[in-house]
Swiss-Prot record:
Organism: Listeria monocytogenes serovar 1/2a (strain ATCC BAA-679 / EGD-e)
Pathway named in the protein's UniProt entry: Isoprenoid biosynthesis; dimethylallyl diphosphate biosynthesis; dimethylallyl diphosphate from (2E)-4-hydroxy-3-methylbutenyl diphosphate: step 1/1; Isoprenoid biosynthesis; isopentenyl diphosphate biosynthesis via DXP pathway; isopentenyl diphosphate from 1-deoxy-D-xylulose 5-phosphate: step 6/6
Co-factor remark: Binds 1 [4Fe-4S] cluster per subunit.
Enzyme active site: 133 (proton donor)
Residues reported to bind dimethylallyl diphosphate: 43, 81, 131, 226, 228, 271
Source domain of life: Bacteria
Catalytic activity: isopentenyl diphosphate + 2 oxidized [2Fe-2S]-[ferredoxin] + H2O = (2E)-4-hydroxy-3-methylbut-2-enyl diphosphate + 2 reduced [2Fe-2S]-[ferredoxin] + 2 H(+); dimethylallyl diphosphate + 2 oxidized [2Fe-2S]-[ferredoxin] + H2O = (2E)-4-hydroxy-3-methylbut-2-enyl diphosphate + 2 reduced [2Fe-2S]-[ferredoxin] + 2 H(+)
One Gene Ontology cellular component annotation held by this UniProt entry: cytosol
GO MF annotation terms: 4 iron, 4 sulfur cluster binding; 4-hydroxy-3-methylbut-2-enyl diphosphate reductase activity; metal ion binding
Protein name: 4-hydroxy-3-methylbut-2-enyl diphosphate reductase
Gene behind this protein: ispH
Residues passing through the membrane, by range: none
Length: 331
């Protein structure tokens, strides 16, 4: 069996930043305890379990406001997906110490929404309903942000203003966003469009579209709640023409998928620990369809290998530089 190791894959800088911020919090004796994360720091249960092992507790729920109601004391970390100003204000009003791990790319989109609101625009935001990033985007300017996920949502819009700005969730499929933006342009010809697929998401999607073409199947390693992981599987099917299977870790890999395969492509979501991908690759490298002794799939739970090992003293400066770069038109 030939294994196509799609590159790039796995952790993006936003995920790494958020994890380092949370790890640093665990090492700071001056922060009020307990330390909670408002939702999953990134959408991967292996990561949240690893943080719980060092005293950083995930509190989850339907939305950020609801989750915050469950936290009464200590420190709260806002996840990489971002939160609305009202959630931040509520946390402060409750007397909680707050730490913001929002990805700079997401912050840039939120800032853009505020700028366009101040300039008198109605904002159409393309995103996945129920995902925390669009929740935060809508909450940034609820009077002018209109969340759409499908063409039916766009059909239902009734906007009288000619000043319309269109942007999107950073982890969407770039092809889906382009399709919906084209549809929006047909209904609102004067709309200004600004695609905000983050570069890490885009290059991972493009890699799958190109590198999975010759594979018999693609294995996408990532949490079932990860939107960017779902989009990678979608890209494999729709753009590379290769069937795809999503697994959280090696224990979910079905032998039936691979026993007759000649080429297997492997990629991973931006919130997937490298250790989990390595286990899949090592298994495939030794797999022999004719030898059942090679079929055993085991996950070695090693939290130390999932969590970042060192503090990054330049973290705040690096994040500020990234935000400035995006504001100046960078990608």
């Amino acid at each position: 069996m030939e294994i196509i190791k799609i590159s790039p894959r796995g952790y993006c800088y936003g995920v790494i930043d958020a994890m380092v911020i949370a790890k640093n919090a665990s090492l700071d004796p001056n922060l009020p305890r307990p330390i909670h994360i408002l939702g999953m720091i990134v959408h991967n249960k292996h990561v949240t379990d690893a943080f719980e092992s060092i005293g950083i507790y995930t509190v989850d729920g339907a939305n950020r406001e609801e989750i915050l109601d469950k936290i009464t004391t200590g420190t709260v970390i806002f996840t990489a997906h971002g939160v609305s100003p009202s959630v931040k204000a509520k946390a402060v009003a409750k007397g909680l110490t707050t730490i913001d791990a929002t990805c700079p790319d997401v912050l840039h989109t939120y800032n853009l929404i505020l700028e366009k609101q101040a300039a008198g625009y109605e904002i159409i935001y393309i995103g996945k309903k129920g995902h925390p990033e669009p929740e935060g985007a809508y909450g940034t300017a609820p009077d002018v942000v209109h969340l759409v996920e499908t063409k039916a949502d766009i059909d239902a819009l009734s906007l009288l203003s000619d000043k319309i700005f269109v942007t999107n969730q950073t982890t969407m499929s770039k092809w889906d966003v382009a399709d919906l933006m084209h549809y929006i342009k047909g209904k609102f010809p004067k709309a200004i469009q600004h695609q905000e697929i983050c570069m890490a998401t885009q290059v991972r999607q493009e890699a799958v579209a190109l590198q999975a073409k010759d594979a018999d199947l693609t294995i996408v390693v990532g949490d079932p709640r990860s939107n960017n992981t779902a989009r990678l599987a979608q890209v494999s099917i729709e753009k590379a023409g290769t069937k795809a299977y999503r697994i959280a870790d090696i224990t979910e890999l079905d032998i039936e998928w691979i026993k007759d395969a000649k080429k297997v492509a492997v990629t991973a979501g931006a919130s997937t620990p490298t250790q989990l991908v390595r286990e899949v690759l090592l298994f495939l490298e030794q797999f022999d369809a004719a030898d059942k002794t090679t079929w055993k799939r085991e996950h070695n739970q090693d939290f130390e290998r999932i969590l970042p090992k060192t503090k990054n003293k330049y973290m705040a400066e690096k994040r500020s530089q990234r935000l400035a770069h995006l504001k100046n038109g960078g990608s």
